[in-house]
Amino acid sequence: VIVGIEGSFRLKMGWVFPNHKDFMLCNFDAAKQLDMSKVDAFIQTNVLGAIKNNMKDQHDFMDNTGKPRIVVEQATFRKNIDFDKPETCYYKVGLNHFTYDEGIFYNKNSPSDRWEKIKKEQNIEIKPWRHMQYTGNEYILFLLQNPIDTSLNPLIESGIRYDDWINKTIRDIRSVTNKKIKIRLHPRFQSRFDLHTLSLLGVEISNEYDGWNKSNGGDSLYKDLKNAWACVTFSSNAATEAICEGVPVVNLHKSSFSWPVSYHTLDILAQDMIECNFDRIQWLYDCAYTQWTLEEINSGIVHRRLLDGNRT
């Protein structure tokens, strides 16, 4: 049996609990009474946050059992899907975590079939890499994240505030290039950023935020990407969409799913043209085997392949 605990599996946020017979949802008190010899794993949405940590008691309990954790998060490819439409949405499902560096997905060297299906369903086009000569009309697009999001755990746990990291990264970019910098705030959490401080750093702040939903930035992201010479981020999932658009990306943390097809230091920004030639093919195939529909999750194939450690 795979146990979900109300709270660490966040039903109130709109997550849908699997209806396969192997899954059981209960409250925390009931979970503590379970015979752990009959529990194979736990299922949760997201992970415990360095800031969002109000479910720490549940996560500590699950940790102490030593059981595997199936972690459900938003999909790797998010274009044209909507979290509020679960019947057509995809979800990333990993073992013990959801990030590129800590999650286990058994997806290395995956075949092409799943990518071909997702590409068609989500209408994703893989555009050639932009080898764009910088003329002064383009900009470095700095993709920001929700300041309290669990994707920033590695930064926050190291004792660095995200605001401070943003300011330092802008200064670090300035130390290697005088190219224009445009900031794209997280569309859902614009009010969580200190716009006054950002304005003092001489950067442009995007005003393109129309059309987003809980899964993606909508058309506004593509408007910002249109004249982007390159992107910089800690680990934003928008970098995945940028890479599909052919925009070179500097990812500054290895938790980002676009890490294998991106640069990892800012010095590349000193060039007038980035000759970006990462091969994205196998990366696309592998990413496709991290995300699943609710129908697939309910069929049992997803948890079986994770818990069995293979592609069953």
Residue ranges and their predicted role:
Residues R130-Q190, Q282-E295:
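Active-site donor-nucleotide binding/catalytic segment of nucleotide-sugar enzymes
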Residues T45-V47, N53, N216-Y263:
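A donor-sugar binding/catalytic signature common to diverse glycosyltransferases
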Residues P86-N137, P260-T312:
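Leloir-type glycosyltransferase catalytic cores
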Residues Q33-E73, V232-F234:
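Short, well-ordered secondary-structure micro-motifs within conserved domains or adaptor modules
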Residues G4-G7, I166-S215:
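Catalytic donor nucleotide-activated moiety binding site of glycosyltransferases and closely related
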Residues I5-G7, T45-V47, E73-T76, N137-S151, ...:
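Short loop/turn segments at strand-loop or loop-helix junctions that form parts
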Residues R10-D29, N54-Q58, S158-D172:
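Well-ordered, non-membrane alpha-helical segments in soluble/globular domains
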Residues V1-G49, D149, G309-T312:
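N-terminal pre-catalytic "stem/leader" segment of glycosyltransferase-like enzymes
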